[in-house]
Amino acid sequence: MNSTPKAVVIFSGGQDSTTCLFQAIQEFGVKNVEVVTFQYGQRHAIELEKAAWIAKDLGVKQTLIDTSVIKAITSNAMMEEREIKQEGNTPNTFVDGRNALFLLYTAIYAKGQGIRTIFTGVCETDFSGYPDCRDVFVKSMNVTLNLAMDYNFNIRTPLMYLTKKQTWALADKLGAFDYIRQHTHTCYLGVEGGCHTCPSCVLREKGLNEYLSEKTSGQKNV
């Protein structure tokens, strides 16, 4: 196999995974980065469309993996037309086992391609109560995958301890601020450009406004 270090990014076409993609490209070079996108039965096709467009636009190979069988065994607001709300400690947008599945399938693919580094955009700081976005889960999954496949994976989570404001700052540092602002999709309701009301849109816009305010203030003080 090619000895050149390569990376694969778990990629949804959203703000976080696109930021990770730019990070991977900066570190490994665009020719050595691939993305894996999952069709898991999400309510809106726009997520898959955005992911495909960005991958093509940036010139990275995209592999689409169908894990929609999960719809037959779990229920949530990400895959069904229902009101988004908090249910106990976890919002009903949480998809049981999703990130575990994503990491498992990505690892299987990565090993076949001779890739050891996997990027995922999960974040514990603004994680909305999703247990599979925690650092302890990712580290546990990394160990499990290494043991399961007798292969040394390195799961990278560059956003793990960043707030959304800091994620926007990282995008700016990577030279991708405008690109991510214009081309990524985050809305739970599938609205192009965002609905401005769902938890995901609110978190994204709050972080954006905080970063722009801080950046403007910093420029004035120079």
From Swiss-Prot:
It catalyses: 7-carboxy-7-deazaguanine + NH4(+) + ATP = 7-cyano-7-deazaguanine + ADP + phosphate + H2O + H(+). The gene is queC. Its EC number is 6.3.4.20. It comes from the Bacteria. This is 7-cyano-7-deazaguanine synthase. It holds the Pfam family QueC. The lineage of its organism: Bacteria, Pseudomonadati, Pseudomonadota, Gammaproteobacteria, Pasteurellales. The keyword Nucleus does not apply. Binds 1 zinc ion per subunit. Catalyzes the ATP-dependent conversion of 7-carboxy-7-deazaguanine (CDG) to 7-cyano-7-deazaguanine (preQ(0)).
